[in-house]
């Protein structure tokens, strides 16, 4: 009787420990599941929206997490069987297995707090902006190839870290920036870890710039929104200072304090680049651009070619009187690619001389405002 009672007490102790650890294992496993789902969401965001590739260590961790979760779930079933078996040895062995698996789950969970989950594909990354291919129109590139080529060469020069593109609105600065961004993403061996595109606009908002950069480098933190501007800057700096990046800033109206935003200054060591567009040459000076490139209006022949391409030869030749008026309409676009493309497309279906004369009259008396469109 005494021996049986002692055996019963021992069994109860082992079963109690086993059940306690089984509960802890279940809680830890659920937490690991949640963490794994969060990491996978971040990975998919980077892969699908920013054309990035998940880090090898993240892929390994996801695989390990999935395996240990399945094993833990099997242990839940085994612990139930062991509890009802009545065997001390069985309960004791199961309790030790569960305890070991609990430590394994906790260890894997502790390694899952990734700041960055993905990198550029083939050495180039980021999105879209940055890392994100920006929609471009082939028709708008006529006459801008030389400027795009110059910016591209600057990206390979060691003594040029900050490049400023300036010129009047509608002259094609954003088109050039888009071409360079997309070319950088398409060519896989240029050595940039992140290619980041940020639209700045007239109303400068430093935290908005920080939030855009944070999304494009794949850093997602639930506490991000509660962080101060300085804390966000420190986290961005921590990540970008270890990587080579190309940062494209479109539509800059005033000096952007990039250091305050957390962006490390480009230098010979990090070999990073910053390229921005602005209407003001003064902003180029304020941004400490080592290279300033003025984007000029198109010469007449280039302007006329671009206009004709968007109108279509069929329309221009549809009536003998249209060609001359069409040239006058194109001249009113003042060599601005945006105006030439927009008005050219609008006139593509106009095949009577009167429609063209009406358009010329409107342009002569109230030139269109292209503010807010591609500049």
Curated annotation (Swiss-Prot):
Q: Which keywords appear in this protein's UniProt record, sorted alphabetically?
A: ATP-binding, Nucleotide-binding, Plant defense
Task: Name the domain of life.
Answer: Eukaryota
Signal sequence annotation? none
Q: What InterPro entries does the annotation carry? A: Apaf_helical, NB-ARC, P-loop_NTPase, Plant_NBS-LRR
Give GO terms for biological process: defense response
Q: Which residues form the NB-ARC domain?
A: 158-372
User: Which molecular-function annotations from GO does this UniProt entry contain?
Assistant: ADP binding; ATP binding
UniProt-annotated binding residues for ATP: 167-174
State if Nucleotide-binding is listed as a keyword.
yes
Give yes or no: UniProt keyword Phosphoprotein.
no
> What is known about what this protein does?
Possible disease resistance protein.
Listed PANTHER family: NB-ARC DOMAIN-CONTAINING PROTEIN, NB-ARC DOMAIN-CONTAINING PROTEIN-RELATED
Q: What is this protein called?
A: Probable disease resistance protein At1g52660
Q: Which organism is it from?
A: Arabidopsis thaliana
């Amino acid at each position: 009787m005494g021996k049986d009672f002692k055996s019963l007490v021992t069994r109860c102790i082992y079963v109690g420990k086993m059940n306690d650890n089984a509960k802890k294992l279940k809680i830890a496993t659920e937490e690991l599941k949640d963490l794994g789902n969060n990491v996978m969401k971040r990975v998919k965001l980077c892969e699908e929206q920013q054309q990035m590739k998940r880090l090898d260590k993240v892929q390994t961790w996801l695989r390990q997490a999935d395996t240990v979760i399945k094993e833990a779930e099997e242990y839940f079933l085994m612990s139930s069987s062991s509890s009802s078996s009545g065997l001390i040895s069985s309960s004791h062995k199961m309790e030790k297995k569960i305890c070991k698996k609990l430590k394994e789950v906790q260890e894997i969970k502790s390694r899952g707090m990734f700041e960055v989950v993905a990198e550029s594909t083939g050495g180039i990354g980021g999105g879209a902006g940055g890392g994100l291919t920006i929609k471009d129109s082939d028709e708008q590139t006529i006459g801008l190839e030389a400027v795009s080529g110059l910016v591209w060469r600057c990206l390979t020069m060691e003594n040029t870290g900050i490049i400023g593109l300036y010129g009047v609105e509608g002259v094609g600065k954003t088109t050039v920036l888009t071409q360079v961004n997309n070319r950088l993403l398409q060519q896989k061996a240029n050595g940039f870890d992140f290619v980041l595109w940020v639209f700045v606009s007239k109303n400068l908002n430093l935290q908005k710039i920080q939030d855009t950069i944070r999304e494009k480098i794949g850093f997602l933190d639930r506490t991000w929104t509660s962080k101060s501007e300085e804390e966000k800057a420190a986290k961005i700096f921590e990540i970008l200072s270890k990587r080579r990046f190309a940062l494209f800033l479109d539509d800059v109206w005033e000096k952007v304090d990039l250091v305050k935003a957390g962006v490390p200054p480009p230098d010979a060591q990090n070999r990073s680049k910053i390229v921005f567009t602005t209407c003001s040459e003064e902003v180029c000076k304020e941004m400490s651009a080592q290279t300033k490139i003025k984007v000029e209006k198109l010469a007449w022949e280039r302007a006329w070619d671009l206009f004709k391409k968007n109108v279509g030869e069929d329309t221009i030749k549809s009536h003998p009187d249209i060609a001359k008026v069409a040239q006058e309409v194109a001249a009113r676009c003042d060599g601005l690619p945006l105006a030439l493309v927009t008005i050219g497309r609008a006139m593509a279906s106009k095949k009577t001389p009167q429609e063209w004369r009406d358009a010329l009259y409107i342009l002569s008396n109230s030139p269109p405002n292209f503010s807010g469109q591609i500049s």
